[in-house]
């Protein structure tokens, strides 16, 4: 990951906020420990913290390119998986490249295609482009919402950043949460409504959205939407198509100029990805490094649940034997998990999933000692129906979020004066209804097919975003 942040002040010289920009950049240093950079002109200043993965020496940011009529400056966090194809297409249109990194491809794509460049990108990204002559800022976020991007309008301008904590470093962004923000945390958390930054003036660029900020306001719109289409393939064709898509996605994500490994829990998703990664690295003459986490005395105290019906270690060892990889174990105990609760929440900027977050926080720290990039099977359950609510009709047909049965328990944590202002059941129901009404369906869908399309969108916009927030 990398960190991006910046501000635009159309009515005054942005230089007066130089110290604020440096503070905003500093709190993002964990996202990008390798390099830092700052761009500044009269009305715009942007900063970047880089985790170098491709073209380590020449991929520095912010990155500026000029045409005969405009100067464009980019700050970018992400990875493009179709970089070679885009580079070739852009070169045919006259683009000249001086680096091998995807950052320059993003910038050249914007120079040639404008906002429509997002429709051509296969990847994960959040970026901003400042057009110096036009005095406008372009913001964009990937289709699924893997890379974060928040913003806040301030008097005469706008600030943006990869994380909420960076925005809060600016003096014009109040550290205020109103009753709507409280309801987001306590009634919908760890999820939150799309576009909501919880704090009173902070908003999120929604996934699959892009647009411009100008002196007259900010205008964002979707460039992609999940669409329902008739499925005409038979079972064998479907299996082959999914196999090729997964293989292609995994292979494209193995492009890196730094060490790369995989998470390995022994489950279907991580085992499949590790197998694919192993094949790619073997072809390069390299050995795959795999990583697993376990807990002290887990063999004594493990209790199965809907989410984890089996303990992992036996399956992990079976995959280790099959892959013949270089495996690394991280064993955590309860005091370690407890000590990491606050750092993990601070990294997320909002209350999260308690020990689920703290364990990942510690696990990733251990992984970084060996590799810079690691493939994970996270979100496979959301995309491929791995959760109980996809299969259990008693949960699936419930008129509400399948992972949240009642608001009564959560409402008891509100003080009386807040509880009187919020109808918890109505608030949660409205959030649920707003999501399922956006689900695209076909006229010929059966009730089950229609419900499964709704379930997919619920998972994409809510449960999955909770996991992606940790990216």
For each feature predicted by the language model, list its residue ranges.
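Cysteine-centered catalytic environments shared across enzyme families
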Residues: 1-347, 360
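Glycine-rich active-site loop/lid subdomains used to bind and stabilize high-energy intermediates
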Residues: 8, 43, 48, 155, ...
């Amino acid at each position: 990951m990398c960190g991006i942040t910046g501000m635009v002040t159309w009515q005054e010289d942005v230089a007066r906020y130089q110290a604020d920009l440096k503070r905003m950049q500093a709190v993002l240093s964990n996202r990008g420990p390798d390099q830092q950079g700052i761009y500044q002109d009269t009305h715009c200043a942007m900063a970047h913290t880089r985790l170098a993965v491709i073209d380590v020496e020449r991929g520095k940011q912010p990155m500026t390119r000029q045409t005969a009529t405009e100067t464009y400056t980019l700050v970018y966090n992400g990875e493009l998986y179709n970089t070679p194809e885009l580079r070739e297409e852009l070169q045919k249109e006259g683009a000249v490249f001086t680096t091998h990194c995807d950052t320059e491809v993003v910038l050249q794509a914007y120079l040639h295609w404008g906002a429509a460049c997002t429709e051509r990108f296969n990847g994960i990204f959040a970026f901003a482009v400042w057009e110096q002559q036009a005095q406008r800022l372009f913001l964009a976020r990937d289709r699924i919402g893997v890379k974060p991007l928040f913003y806040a309008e301030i008097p005469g301008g706008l600030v943006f950043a990869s994380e909420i904590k960076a925005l809060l470093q600016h003096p014009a962004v109040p550290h205020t949460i109103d009753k709507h923000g409280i309801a987001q945390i306590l009634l919908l958390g760890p999820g939150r409504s799309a576009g909501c930054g919880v704090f009173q003036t902070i908003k999120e660029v929604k996934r699959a959205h892009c647009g411009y900020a100008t002196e007259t306001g900010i205008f964002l719109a979707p460039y992609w939407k999940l669409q329902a289409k008739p499925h005409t393939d038979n079972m064998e064709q479907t299996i082959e198509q999914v196999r090729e898509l997964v293989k292609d996605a995994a292979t494209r994500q193995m492009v890196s100029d730094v060490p790369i490994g995989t998470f390995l829990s022994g489950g279907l998703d991580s085992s499949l990805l590790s197998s694919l990664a192993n094949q790619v690295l073997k072809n390069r003459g390299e050995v795959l490094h795999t990583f697993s986490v376990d807990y002290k005395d887990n063999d004594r105290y493990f209790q199965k649940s809907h989410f984890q019906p089996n303990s992992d270690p036996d399956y992990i060892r079976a995959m280790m034997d099959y892959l013949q990889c270089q495996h690394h174990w991280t064993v955590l105990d309860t005091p370690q998990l407890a000590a990491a609760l606050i750092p993990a929440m601070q990294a997320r900027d909002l209350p999260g999933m308690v020990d689920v977050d703290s364990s990942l926080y510690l696990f990733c720290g251990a992984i970084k000692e060996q590799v810079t990039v690691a493939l994970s099977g996270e979100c496979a359950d959301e995309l491929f129906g791995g959760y109980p609510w996809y299969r259990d009709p008693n949960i699936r047909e419930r008129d509400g979020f399948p992972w949240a049965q009642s608001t009564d328990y959560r409402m008891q944590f509100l003080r009386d004066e807040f509880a009187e202002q919020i109808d918890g059941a109505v608030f949660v129901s409205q959030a649920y209804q707003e999501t399922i009404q956006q689900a695209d369906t076909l006229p010929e869908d059966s009730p089950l097919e229609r419900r499964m399309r709704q379930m997919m969108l619920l998972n994409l916009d809510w449960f999955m975003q909770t996991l992606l927030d940790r990216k």
